């Protein structure tokens, strides 16, 4: 009877923990979206809109190592880094906007996933080699972290791809309603309010957005094979957190005397962190989503400080993998300097950077390719480079006056740069 009471208590606790995680994850994602939607008015009032970008330890390390200087603005990243030592990969399951996006899309792809019998490579160690590749490239002198940092990817996805298409869809919908007189007297004020409060006056258009559309589409549709495929196998930030999770105070432990090996936790684990028996767990792969604890009908799952050694599955890394990553970085990084555009006689590229940009070499080193400056540009004049700044400068911002001029009274792009690649300017100084 006593065991049954304890089991019921643990079951309720697991369900509560899971619901708390869902609420926190939803609120954090809503905050991320709101900061993107209301970036303009918040930045106008000197508010902080780049907090998520400054929370990425990977971006912080990338910008500081490449620029060879300490960037104080990345203090949130250090808090996350220290917290990950004690809490494991909590950031991936509770905070990361790309992870939340994949949770949403994976649920939409659930039926399709069950219909696909063919499986692709599911190698969790691959992300560690990608991390090694990126870190070595920094010491060689090239900043590639921004291309694969999940926070930068999320910001770009919603700024360059999703937001423009969403605005166009909303405008088309209200344009259709405008044709009906008895509806338009209500729909027109609503449309005007949405334009003023939520969207740009005109749908923004970004050159080269199709490239990022392909990138985010591939990341999403890999979910047809495995849930959170990006997080499992490719995310370098997740690899960094996994390396720190060995000291976590929340580790999955299974009561062997209670577990009936139903295998449900293994099937439902979105990270593939649980083995076929349901008893063993890769601590570095667990993102503390708490679902295994919530669905366990025998209440055998707990999260505690210590994990029995027989229940721990170590990271299976190979020397060959690391050597391959290092050699690849040494070969690929220098190739990024290949130029595809003619330069001026002084050797400078024929591109215009945003106002307040630091010298070009430092700019490339510090810029994390997040697209935040493009999001707040009122005239849609800032666009990502493709090959205009060589491969090493791909996806850094450039001003294209033919598309949108630089407004004399606007300094928003100088207020939202998380890394300091664009320094703050007053309107008078500009």
Regions flagged by a language model, labelled:
Residues 2-279, 284-430:
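Non-ligating segments of multi-cofactor redox enzymes
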């Amino acid at each position: 009877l006593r065991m049954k009471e304890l089991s019921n208590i643990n079951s309720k606790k697991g369900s509560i923990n899971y619901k708390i995680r869902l609420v926190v994850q939803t609120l954090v994602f809503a905050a991320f979206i709101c900061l993107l939607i209301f970036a303009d008015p918040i930045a106008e009032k000197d508010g902080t809109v780049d907090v998520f970008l400054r929370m990425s330890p990977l971006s912080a390390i990338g910008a500081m190592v490449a620029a060879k200087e300490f960037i104080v603005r990345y203090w949130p990243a250090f808090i996350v880094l220290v917290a990950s030592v004690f809490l494991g990969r909590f950031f991936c399951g509770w905070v990361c906007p790309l992870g939340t996006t994949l949770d949403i899309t994976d649920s939409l792809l659930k039926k399709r996933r069950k219909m696909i019998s063919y499986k692709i490579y599911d190698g969790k160690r691959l992300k560690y080699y990608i991390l090694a590749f990126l870190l070595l490239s920094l010491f060689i002198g090239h900043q590639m972290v921004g291309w694969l940092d999940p926070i930068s990817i999320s910001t770009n996805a919603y700024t360059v791809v999703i937001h423009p298409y969403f605005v166009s869809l909303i405008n088309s919908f209200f344009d259709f309603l405008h044709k009906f007189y008895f509806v338009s007297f209500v729909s027109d004020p609503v449309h005007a309010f949405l334009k003023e409060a939520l969207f740009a006056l005109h749908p923004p258009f970004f050159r080269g957005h199709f490239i990022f559309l392909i990138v985010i589409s591939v990341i999403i549709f890999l979910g047809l094979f495995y849930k959170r495929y990006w997080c499992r196998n490719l995310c370098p930030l997740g690899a960094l957190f996994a390396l720190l999770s060995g000291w976590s105070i929340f580790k999955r432990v299974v009561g062997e005397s209670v577990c009936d090996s139903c295998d449900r936790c293994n099937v439902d684990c979105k990270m593939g962190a649980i083995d076929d028996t349901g008893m063993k767990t890769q601590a570095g792969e667990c993102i503390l989503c708490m679902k295994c604890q919530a669905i366990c009908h025998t209440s055998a799952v707990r999260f505690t400080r210590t994990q029995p050694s027989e229940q721990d599955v170590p990271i299976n890394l190979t020397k060959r993998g690391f050597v391959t990553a290092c050699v690849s970085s040494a070969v690929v990084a220098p190739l990024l300097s290949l130029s595809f555009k003619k330069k001026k006689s002084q050797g400078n590229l024929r591109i215009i950077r945003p106002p307040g940009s630091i010298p070009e070499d430092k700019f490339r080193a510090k810029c994390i390719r997040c697209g935040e400056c493009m999001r707040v540009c009122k005239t849609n004049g800032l666009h990502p480079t493709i090959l205009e700044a060589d491969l090493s400068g791909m996806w850094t911002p450039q001003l294209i006056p033919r598309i949108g001029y630089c407004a004399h009274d606007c300094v928003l792009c100088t207020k939202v740069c998380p890394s300091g690649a664009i320094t703050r300017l007053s309107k008078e100084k500009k």
